[in-house]
Amino acid sequence: MKTDTSTFLAQQIVRLRRRDQIRRLMQRDKTPLAILFMAAVVGTLTGLVGVAFEKAVSWVQNMRIGALVQVADHAFLLWPLAFILSALLAMVGYFLVRKFAPEAGGSGIPEIEGALEELRPVRWWRVLPVKFIGGMGTLGAGMVLGREGPTVQIGGNLGRMVLDVFRMRSAEARHTLLATGAAAGLSAAFNAPLAGILFIIEEMRPQFRYNLISIKAVFTGVIMSSIVFRIFNGEAPIIEVGKLSDAPVNTLWLYLILGIIFGCVGPVFNSLVLRTQDMFQRFHGGEIKKWVLMGGAIGGLCGILGLIEPEAAGGGFNLIPIAAAGNFSVGLLLFIFITRVVTTLLCFSSGAPGGIFAPMLALGTLLGTAFGMAAAVLFPQYHLEAGTFAIAGMGALMAASVRAPLTGIVLVLEMTDNYQLILPMIITCLGATLLAQFLGGKPLYSTILARTLAKQDAEQAAKNQNASAGENT
């Protein structure tokens, strides 16, 4: 009897253990539905705000250009008006940033990276209106900036806003929704959902806590953001360059050469960005009046430049198809490239609210097309198409500068719908990234974040020192 009882108890214990193991196994992949629901909300909001931001910037640009068209026959009015309109619009952006939310200046992507590490604040109630309205001013003025930086920062801040509205206190939820909003923001800017996901995994890999919950939330947010974008803007690729021919195997070595060129250009470009930032900091010294006037002057010059050489101003999306089609000579391509390098440095490094992705894509297109046209002359037996080198170069500068080759490859392929060029793009972007790393170049966003944190620590140390001095007196 005792033996039967012992056997029965042993069997019950085994059953309970198995049941507990099955329960734990089932719960291991049980993503909290609340986080997925909030990720869907964040993605939807980011898509709506991203589309609204794009439409608002286009409206400001059209209003400015429309005003200039009215006086196009009167040169004595046209040139001053072009300067004044762009200067005033730019000054709005600079003033709002400096006065209400300094963290909204520049791209905003380093701020999201810092927030993921709990090193930078997320004041969404300030950043959202400042980044939106300020970006309308600077991008509407025709400055050489992109809208992807604002939408990424706006998306991340929307993620924190949703978290606060639903009163979630979990550190995991806070981190996950911030990353979800950032990924949805990139997707909303470029209609590139896969690039948005890869951007979080690759570019923000030191900060992103990869687990089943976070990655499912990012997927959910990006899906919703992309759906919203396509409802309003359609499903066509954001950059229309047409279907280009494949790259024959015997020409792939040329793409490696192109990657080597960008591997040299990337670190130099990053160094110029940082040095220009230091130059502007020395000029205005943190004084809001000097900073706003400086921004107005840069904006006004971009307005004038838009009259002289329209291709040298603006984010660059309109320039990319024209350049990739081979409508410029090699000399003119290089001239526009140098001009846009200068304008990109002035606009981005001055702290204007706006991104640098779009300007870098345009720069890569210009240099890639110039290389392709030169190679076509040097190697006529290959029957090369310059547009394929334009596509490869478009992602190569981003890969070398930001050190995110996968994101650069997928982003360009999604934006242009030329997936058949994936092999030459891999060769170009990988070559650019490896050489940039070998030359000692540092990722641009990580370097900017490190400088921001160093400045933050210095300011905090100065405050503590002043407080101690006050107590001693």
From Swiss-Prot:
- According to UniProt, where does the site described as Mediates proton transfer from the outer aqueous phase to the interior of the protein lie? 148
Leader sequence range is none
Q: Name one Pfam family in it.
A: Voltage_CLC
Q: Which residues cross the membrane?
A: 33-69, 77-100, 124-141, 148-166, 215-232, 253-281, 288-309, 330-349, 355-376, 422-438
Pull the Cytoplasmic topological domain ranges from the record: 1-32, 117-123, 167-176, 202-214, 282-287, 439-473
Sequence motif Selectivity filter part_1, residues:
106-110
- The name of this protein is H(+)/Cl(-) exchange transporter ClcA
Native species of this protein? Salmonella paratyphi C (strain RKS4594)
The taxonomic lineage of its organism, from the top, reads: Bacteria, Pseudomonadati, Pseudomonadota, Gammaproteobacteria, Enterobacterales
Gene behind the chain? clcA
